[in-house]
């Protein structure tokens, strides 16, 4: 399977360059989310608190602020625009026709924005995912949709729908707890989060993993657990980034083959389907 980032693009993408030059309210401007009022969507949290002061950034060419849930060079697409939704379908069709077996759907909780909400996990997002799944099922055989929703299990389970949204969903909270359990020599961190994990449709499955291309995220742990993870896995202050640890698998485990094998044995023995990020298979 391959990565499909549908929430945002680069600010260098031709869509954004075209949008910032287009008149307000025009077809191409509406590929992105713009405002002249930075109080709009004020209840949405800032995800990268260490680098981004706001979810809005001023664009001098457009003479307006654009919305971004992540870095300011990653403007969010406007999923209220049917043309944007169709662009996503076209992109997926292209890659499916080339033989891709599935897609990791990046940052799916943030596709839509509504005033008076935190702009996460909105009903409109699930309506769109059902449309996307129906499109894939109607036009392609045996394709997989994997949701990236860095949430607690009871929240991320919503991205399975009734078996009509994503086939799989990352289980983010279990990942740091595997590292925690091995260091503590105690199964409790793992068992505790498994006990908090709801039942899901029979046709769906959790994806479990040790590392990916992002930092080892510590969003889905308690403050006490986060402090413990920083203490034992990121003694170098430069390893801390945002709410996580930027180290690869082998350095996290002291480049010790036995520890690496132990973590992989644990990964393959837990409920769920193991997911291996390509560049981390052997390191």
Which stretches of residues belong to each language-model region?
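Active-site and adjacent substrate-binding regions of carbohydrate-active enzymes
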Residues: 1-281
């Amino acid at each position: 399977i391959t990565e499909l980032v549908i929430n945002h693009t680069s600010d260098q993408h031709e869509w954004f360059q075209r949008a910032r030059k287009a008149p307000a309210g025009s077809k191409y401007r509406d590929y992105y989310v713009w405002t002249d009022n930075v109080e709009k969507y004020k209840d949405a949290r800032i995800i990268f608190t260490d680098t981004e002061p706001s979810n809005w950034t001023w664009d001098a060419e457009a003479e307006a602020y654009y919305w971004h849930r992540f870095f300011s060079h990653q403007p969010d697409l406007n999923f209220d625009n049917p043309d944007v939704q169709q662009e996503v379908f076209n992109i997926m069709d292209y890659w499916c026709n080339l033989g891709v077996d599935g897609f990791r759907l990046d940052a799916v909780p943030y596709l839509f924005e509504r005033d008076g909400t935190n702009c996460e996990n909105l009903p409109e997002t699930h309506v769109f995912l059902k449309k996307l799944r129906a499109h894939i099922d109607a036009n392609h055989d045996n394709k997989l949709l994997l949701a990236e929703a860095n949430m607690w299990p009871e929240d991320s389970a919503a991205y399975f729908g009734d078996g009509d949204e994503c086939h799989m969903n990352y289980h983010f909270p279990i990942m740091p707890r595997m590292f925690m359990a091995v260091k503590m020599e105690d199964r409790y961190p793992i068992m505790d989060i498994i006990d908090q994990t709801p039942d899901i449709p029979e046709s769906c499955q959790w994806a479990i993993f040790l590392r990916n291309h992002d930092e080892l995220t510590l969003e889905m742990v308690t403050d006490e657990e986060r402090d413990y993870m920083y203490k034992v896995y990121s003694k170098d202050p430069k390893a801390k980034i945002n709410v996580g640890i930027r180290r690869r698998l082998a350095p996290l485990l002291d480049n010790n083959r036995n520890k690496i094998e132990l973590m992989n044995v644990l990964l393959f023995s837990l409920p769920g389907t193991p997911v291996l990020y390509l560049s981390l298979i052997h390191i």
